[in-house]
């Protein structure tokens, strides 16, 4: 059985990838490393929900419990146009490092389940890091299971967030652009 490290952004997004990988006879371990999540209360909700789901699924997850917002901001400030690229790179780099050190056969991410993420960019970064760290990036398009996972997460009354986690996506989700008077 091959051992794979699944970088995990939250409980709901882990449902379909975890089930799929297990059905393919992978021994799946999770990694919760998400320095992008803001504010701390959101980070804690996502972390706690994942811990609860992992226990229900008898799934071992490595939790980086340190709130690393400063590290994330140092990566993206003044690079806002490339913030998703920087964020994916941070999180997948940590997954590749841990997978390599832990003698995993591959690493992947739950980010591949969301139709709202930049799928090809995630794949490209994962493959580049795989080459850099000499550990395979397992690519699978998990998006076909997004609706199924959403339904299941609602049935399980899981905490479901409304934005990717970063302060920029929170702004984009909730803040309406100001109306301008007298012009376009």
Summary of predicted features, one role per range:
Residues 1-184:
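Nucleotide-activated chemistry modules centered on ATP-dependent adenylation/adenylyltransferase
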């Amino acid at each position: 059985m091959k051992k794979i490290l699944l970088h995990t952004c939250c409980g709901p997004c882990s449902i379909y990838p975890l089930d799929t990988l297990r059905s393919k006879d992978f021994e799946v371990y999770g990694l919760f490393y998400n320095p992008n999540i803001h504010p701390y209360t959101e980070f804690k909700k996502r972390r706690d929900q994942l811990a609860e789901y992992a226990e229900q699924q008898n799934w071992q997850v490595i939790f980086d419990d340190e709130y690393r917002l400063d590290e994330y901001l140092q990566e993206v400030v003044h690079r806002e146009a490339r913030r998703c690229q920087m964020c994916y790179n941070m999180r997948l780099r940590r997954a590749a490092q841990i997978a390599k050190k832990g003698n995993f056969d591959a690493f992947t991410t739950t980010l591949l389940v969301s139709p709202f993420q930049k799928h090809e960019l995630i794949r490209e970064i994962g493959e580049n890091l795989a080459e850099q760290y000499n550990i395979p990036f397992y690519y699978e398009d998990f998006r076909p299971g997004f609706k199924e996972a959403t339904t299941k997460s609602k049935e399980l009354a899981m905490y479901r967030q409304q934005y990717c986690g970063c302060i920029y996506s929170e702004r984009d989700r909730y803040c309406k652009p100001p109306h301008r008077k007298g012009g376009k």
